[in-house]
Amino acid sequence: MARYRCCRSQSRSRCRRRRRRCRRRRRRCCRRRRRVCCRRYTVRCRRRR
């Protein structure tokens, strides 16, 4: 079950349905919640704890 965490600019439901948008901001980490839109890059963002 892939859960896509989106940044404040994107909503959860939108990110889940539109994965193409995630690829665009795949390098963008949410500084507030330290989470990335795409789950692949969540590990990278989580490392910055």
Curated annotation (Swiss-Prot):
Keywords annotated in UniProt: Chromosome, Developmental protein, Differentiation, DNA condensation, DNA-binding, Nucleosome core, Nucleus, Spermatogenesis
GO cellular component: nucleosome; nucleus
GO biological process: chromosome condensation; sperm DNA condensation
A GO MF term: DNA binding
Domain of life: Eukaryota
Keyword Signal among record annotations: no
Annotated compartments: Nucleus; Chromosome
Tissue occurrence: Testis.
InterPro entries, alphabetized: Protamine_P1
Annotated coiled-coil segments of the chain: none
Family: Belongs to the protamine P1 family.
Function: Protamines substitute for histones in the chromatin of sperm during the haploid phase of spermatogenesis. They compact sperm DNA into a highly condensed, stable and inactive complex.
Protein name: Sperm protamine P1
Gene that this polypeptide is encoded by: PRM1
